[in-house]
Curated annotation (Swiss-Prot):
GO terms for molecular function: UDP-N-acetylglucosamine transmembrane transporter activity; UDP-xylose transmembrane transporter activity. This is UDP-N-acetylglucosamine transporter YEA4. Its main location: Golgi. It is found in: Golgi apparatus membrane. It comes from the Eukaryota. The keyword Metal-binding does not apply. Belongs to the nucleotide-sugar transporter family. SLC35A subfamily. Sugar transporter that specifically mediates the transport of UDP-N-acetylglucosamine (UDP-GlcNAc) from the cytosol into Golgi vesicles where glycosyltransferases function. Keywords: Golgi apparatus, Membrane, Sugar transport, Transmembrane, Transmembrane helix, Transport. InterPro entries: SCL35B1-4/HUT1. One of its GO terms (cellular component) is endoplasmic reticulum membrane. The gene is YEA4. Signal peptide: none annotated. The chain crosses the membrane at residues 1-21, 30-50, 66-86, 98-118, 122-142, 166-186, 198-218, 241-261, 274-294, 298-318.
Length: 328
């Protein structure tokens, strides 16, 4: 498959996924994060099910696993917890642009966890770029809608446009990002030990997590009901059948989520890690700009400078990653 088509899946799927999600939460007083996460897990499970089943016998059964079940279960815990946290942060007054910016600190967290847990060593350029990204993320978060001033350096969070609610939201994003960093390191170890069976990992990470959603069945039911009654209706394109707008965007979000995941995995299998990192970085930048432009999200000049700093640091890290992390 051509590189252009793969890039189209990555940019089209991932950017559209961000836009469809923001369209659902924009101007809404209800939290839809759990129902979005649940439907995404169901969709990916169903789409990946044919790859996981052995059709040579009846009744059909799951194919033999290449990776131990306990490894899948640990990955499920990290992935599920991180996904639920990421999709729930918007009820804490965190906008999509700020969400994207903070998640860029994942490189720094991965580096710290890799050094502390996996005994990895990193080049000076990688460490410097990680510090640059972290500083940029902090600046963009603290001064999201107010400009920097000397008075704002005092510890009164209100002076920089922060509240206890939004600060807790930032904490949730950071925890979710740290869990994803742990998951990345776990997957790296798993692929090195058991082989690069990413399709198996993708299926089990979603399939095994489905029972966990039953712990919040009441919340899922209420969110789905609110999704239907709190939304205007629209006509489905082509067939012209009426449907709740937010429900339509939920379906679109699930479709674009699969396209995004497929494009990223295809890109990972057709190029090197540096190119993948650069492409995903540019994709995040495009998502950020689209969110600000389409939904008129406000970012101060200081926040823009912080954003530029984040992506500058990420670019330097991508360049420095040509020399991979060395074991101690």
């Amino acid at each position: 498959m051509s590189f252009v088509l793969i890039l189209s899946l990555v940019f089209g799927g991932c950017c559209s996924n961000v836009i469809s999600f923001e369209h659902m939460v924009q101007g809404s007083n209800i939290n839809l994060g759990n129902i979005v996460t649940f439907t995404q897990f169901v969709s990916v499970t169903l789409i990946q099910l044919p790859n996981a089943l052995d059709f040579s016998h009846f009744p059909f059964r799951l194919r033999p696993r290449h990776i131990p079940l306990k490894i899948h279960m640990l990955a499920v815990f990290l992935f599920f917890t991180s996904s639920v946290a990421n999709n729930s942060v918007f009820k804490f007054d965190i906008s999509v642009p700020i969400h994207i910016i903070i998640r860029c600190s994942g490189t720094t967290l991965t580096m710290i966890i890799g050094w502390a847990v996996c005994n990895k060593r990193y080049s000076k350029l990688q460490v410097q770029s990680a510090i640059i990204m972290t500083l940029g993320a902090i600046v963009a978060s603290l001064y999201r809608d107010k400009e920097f001033s000397m008075d704002s350096l005092k510890l009164n969070t209100d002076s920089v446009g922060m509240t206890q609610k939004s600060m807790f939201g930032i904490f949730v994003v950071l925890v979710a990002t740290a869990l994803m960093s742990l998951l990345s390191l776990l997957n790296e170890w798993t692929y090195n030990k058991c082989g690069k069976h990413w399709k198996e990992t993708l299926f089990y990470s979603h399939f095994l997590a489905l029972p966990l959603f039953m712990l919040g069945y009441t919340r899922l039911r209420d969110e789905f009901r609110d999704l239907l009654i709190s939304s205007d209706s629209m006509d489905i394109p082509i067939v012209k059948l009426p449907i709740a707008t937010k429900l339509f965007m939920l379906i679109a979000n699930n479709v674009t989520q699969f396209i995004c995941i497929k494009g990223v995995n295809m890109l990972a299998s057709n190029t090197d890690a540096l190119t993948l990192s650069v492409v995903l970085l540019v994709r995040k930048f495009v998502s950020l700009l689209l969110s600000v432009y389409i939904y008129k999200n406000v970012l101060s000049v200081t926040a823009y400078l912080g954003t530029i700093t984040v992506f500058l640091g990420a670019g330097l890290y991508s360049y420095g990653s040509v020399k991979t992390a060395l074991p101690r």
